[in-house]
Amino acid sequence: MQGRTTLERIARAAADFDVHALSGSRLIEARSLAVGLVGEPLASLETMAWVYDRTKLGLLGVTYAGLNGEPDPKDSSPLCGLLGVVPLTIAGNQAVLEDAFNAISPAPAHICTSEEEPAGIFGWGIAVSRHEAARLLVNLGMFISEHIIPTADWYMRAVTDDGARLLKGRMKLTVVEGSKIGTLRMPSHQKAEAFFLQTRGAA
C-alpha cells in the first residue's frame, strides 16, 4: 500500500486485491462489458481514457484469473468485474451535491490530478459478470474508504435495480439530501465512525 500520493496509494491497494486501473485495449473491453451488463448511457472511451491519464484511476477491473488467484503472464484473462473510482476536486464534490456533476462527460475542473488530494470519490458504478467479483470490489471500496481516504465521502448513481439493491443494501448508501436525480452517498469512514460512537453513547 506504499505510494507517494493518495491516488497512488489507492491504486496500490487495488493491486493488492488483484484489481487494476484500466487503459488502452482493456478500456475497450471494459466498456463493452459494462454496456452488456448495465447498458447505455456510459462515459465514452475518450472520457475514460482522459480520466485515467489525469488520475491513473478511473475504471478499475478484475479478471477471471485475478479473481481466482491464478497467474496471467500474458494479461489475456477476460474481465469479470469493474469498479469506477473517480476522485473529485472540491469543486467536483460540490457539483455532485448540487446535481451539477456530469458523470457521462465530467468537467476536467471537477476531477483531481494525480497530485491532488480528493475531496470525494464519484463511483462510475459496479458492473460484474460474477457474484464473487461484486463481493471483491465492494470489499475493496470499503478498504479504500477506511484506510486510505477516511475523510472522503463516496457518491454513486444506480442505473439498474440490482445496482440499487447493492448500493443501498450492502454498502448502505443513502440519497443525497435535496438530490432530484437520485445521487447516493456513502459517508466517509470518519463520519460513519463518529455517528456510530454518538448513537452508541446515546443508547
Where are these regions (language model features)?
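Terminal substrate-recognition subdomain of acyl/acetyltransferases
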Residues: M1-S23, L37-V38, E117-P118, F122, ...
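Short intrinsically disordered coil segments
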Residues: E98-N102, G141, T199-A202
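A short acidic (Asp/Glu
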Residues: P71-P73, L83, R165-G169
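Conserved acyl-donor/pantetheine-binding loop and adjacent beta-alpha core of acyl/acetyltransferases
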Residues: G84-G125
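A structural signal for short, well-ordered beta-strand segments and their strand-loop junctions
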Residues: G61-V62, L79-V85, D153-R157
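Conserved acetyl-CoA-binding loop-helix of GNAT-fold acetyltransferases
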Residues: G120-H147
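Short amphipathic alpha-helix that is part of the acyltransferase structural core
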Residues: Q2-L79
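Catalytic micro-motifs at enzyme active sites that drive phosphoryl/nucleotidyl and oxygen chemistry
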Residues: T47-V51, A109-C112, M142-S145
